[in-house]
């Protein structure tokens, strides 16, 4: 299968290149860029220099259906809203890694993203690509809205508990930490080395745009928004840890929680449940498509505490996009994603 990437020079795009280059079902990768057409990716990024790459191309909708079968959009907000429709009309399947198509309410999107939403009809076509919970609809989709990094970590931890009626659905607090690559490649004072090294900081207090995405998806499972979600920036490049607190809806035990999570993810190759009261760390999933989940029932407070870790560029972006690509086209779900985490 021949695939294309728009936004190949960003961090998520580069991760897509790494994964798709080793995918057993991918025969060709075309890289597209309007700002850097004519450049070669291995000149821009020397870690790719041993591979032979065609120059970055401008998109020509009259030719694109003859060049590729699937397009990955690893682009900033607004680009997918413009390009997804024409790409679908050209006969391609589209996997969008941006937030343009995740929110079904246009007013909510415009409030949180501070920009116009996608055209009417496009959002309705998009399937939310949380691989472990939307497999049946992903398998028949032509357009995937790949989940955000924070929502992926939070949703995988919370859906089993909400589904089982284990927590008070209006008591959820999500306290999340992310590495600097989650902010993208463009340098800012927020991610400057001098600002992040030996530093730990809160940001976008009560205003992060992943908040309505988490609320929208949890509402489908019976949760009652609003919830509290707060991200922090950690002095590391990759990784997310979401520590989640919720009031138990009934007396629980760690044994019950273990059974709940093991049952929910029995057939999920990329979700690993910690045993015997152990908890995950971001290093445990570094460079992989895994989500590791640990948990505890605090009898003293009557709260459930859950820790969920992912690599934000993998399970939080490119890895889950490739997982959805596999599901859409009937490939083994793990194809191209079998690499074990890098450690230390």
Curated annotation (Swiss-Prot):
Gene name of this polypeptide: argC
Pathway annotation from the record: Amino-acid biosynthesis; L-arginine biosynthesis; N(2)-acetyl-L-ornithine from L-glutamate: step 3/4
Classification lineage: Bacteria, Bacillati, Bacillota, Bacilli, Bacillales
Protein's name in the database: N-acetyl-gamma-glutamyl-phosphate reductase
Single Gene Ontology MF annotation: NAD binding
InterPro entries: AGPR_AS, AGPR_type-1, NAD(P)-bd_dom_sf, NAGSA_dehydrogenase, Semialdehyde_DH_NAD-bd
Protein's organism: Shouchella clausii (strain KSM-K16)
Subcellular location: Cytoplasm
Coiled-coil positions: none
Catalytic activity field: N-acetyl-L-glutamate 5-semialdehyde + phosphate + NADP(+) = N-acetyl-L-glutamyl 5-phosphate + NADPH + H(+)
């Amino acid at each position: 299968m021949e695939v294309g990437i728009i936004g190949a020079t960003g961090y998520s795009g580069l991760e897509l290149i790494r994964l798709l280059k080793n995918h057993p079902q991918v025969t060709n990768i075309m890289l597209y860029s309007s700002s850097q057409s004519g450049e070669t990716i291995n000149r821009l990024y020397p870690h790719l220099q041993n591979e032979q790459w065609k120059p970055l191309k401008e998109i020509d909708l009259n030719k694109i259906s003859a060049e590729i079968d699937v397009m990955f959009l690893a682009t900033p907000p607004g680009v997918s809203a413009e390009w997804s429709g024409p790409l679908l009309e050209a006969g391609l399947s589209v996997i969008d890694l941006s937030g343009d198509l995740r929110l079904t309410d246009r007013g909510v999107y415009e409030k949180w993203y501070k920009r116009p939403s996608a055209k009417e009809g496009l959002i309705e076509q998009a399937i939310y690509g949380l691989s472990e919970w939307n497999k049946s609809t992903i398998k028949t989709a032509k357009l995937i809205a790949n989940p955000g990094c924070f929502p992926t970590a939070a949703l995988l931890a919370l859906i089993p508990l909400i589904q089982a009626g284990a927590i008070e659905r209006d008591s959820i607090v999500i306290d999340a930490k992310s590495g600097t690559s989650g902010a993208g490649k463009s340098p800012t004072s927020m991610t400057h080395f001098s600002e992040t090294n030996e530093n730990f900081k809160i940001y976008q207090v009560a205003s992060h745009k992943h908040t309505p995405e988490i609320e929208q998806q949890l509402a489908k499972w019976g949760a009652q928004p609003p919830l509290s979600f707060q991200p922090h920036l950690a002095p590391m490049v990759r990784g997310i840890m979401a520590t989640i607190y919720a009031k138990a809806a009934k007396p629980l035990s760690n044994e019950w929680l273990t059974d709940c999570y093991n049952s929910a993810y029995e057939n999920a190759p990329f979700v690993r449940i910690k045993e015997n009261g152990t908890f995950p760390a971001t290093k445990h999933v570094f460079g992989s498509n895994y989500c590791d989940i640990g948990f505890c029932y605090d009898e003293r407070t009557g709260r459930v505490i859950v820790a969920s870790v992912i690599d934000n560029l993998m399970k939080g972006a490119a890895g889950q996009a490739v997982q959805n690509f596999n599901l859409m086209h009937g490939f083994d779900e793990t194809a191209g994603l079998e690499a074990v985490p890098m450690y230390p």
